């Protein structure tokens, strides 16, 4: 809570245009709910984590996570598990929010080079647009698709002005430290800390290891 307060002071002094504020634990009771009028809510993949506090099922955790949804604020989320989708969409409906779900069908990996990935995105905002992320982490394709969709929602609502070329260049420059980060030959660092995250890491590492342990 102290760090969040300090962050708000820094944002204010720097006169930032947009703040990306990530919840620390869940959402419903998280300190970030001090922000009463966000311009957009984003919910990434929901998996079992912090079960002692958030609940021991995906559905219980989804209810906590959906607690960030505010009245008349659009929400962009990963639409994969039906039970989770139902909870998020119901919360959005109850709060008169437009909900935008990003599904596995929206994006397709064109080529994975190990150190970067080319993929295409096809939804209401992108028509098979191609992007490149500078990481071999396959799971980041989904995360990037979520971020790109969120950016377009912000553009649609008039919060930001974005040019297509600038978006493509920005995506290519993004780096995720501590997520499939190569720090030496054959040595990668990744902060996966729950079963789903570990499965995603294994999926990304497998093409690189080629059967080696």
What are these regions (language model features)?
Residues 97-103, 181, 188:
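General small-molecule cofactor/ligand-binding pocket signal
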Residues 104-106, 110-111:
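Conserved "HGTGT" condensation-loop signature of ketosynthase/thiolase-family condensing enzymes
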